[in-house]
Amino acid sequence: MKYDQKALYAELTHFYLSICEKEQLDEPRIRGLVGSLVRKARQAIPEEWDDKAKIHQLLQLFYGDWSFHCDADNYFYARNLYLPYILEEREGMPVSLGALILYLAASLKLPIYPVNFPTQLILRAEVDGEVAFIDPWSGKYISVDELKKLYEGAFGFGAQIQPEDLARADIPMLIARFRQLAKNALIREEQNDLAFNYIQFLLAGRKD
């Protein structure tokens, strides 16, 4: 069964559609902005390059040329999950920037996948039997030793990282974690009407 690299981006889109006022909805514009990124990436990444070179170039484009980034002082705000803000301001949080990278990777047929790491979303690139991990905060590669330190920081000294912590994410678990993060962000900012709308949207989806 083919892995759905675009699942997290689809959930980001659902979040936008569920909390946005109808008169403010501009889904065609969002599709246009994302489509433009895909076209630019295809133009900048030669088809004849190998996957390692393509992935490196994609990260350079996204975090370098296009200036997508996380702001250490503001990354936790709900706006960093809101597609128009992310695409216009080029700012997000690891899960939203990671969702965009995954969407672009799928469009370019590049083997980048999400990892449901305990501290935040991590990406893994699988090329020629090798795995490299990418921090969507910065687009930089992160070693297993660095991930082990993050794991110990979250769970205490001596905590042992498990293979499943570095594996491709289970999609339902990944989506559930995103939804909880989105709800928490809205409630923390006391955007209660938006949180209610989002919860109603999720409940309606369950009924379907």
Where are these regions (language model features)?
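A structural boundary/capping signal
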Residues: 1-208
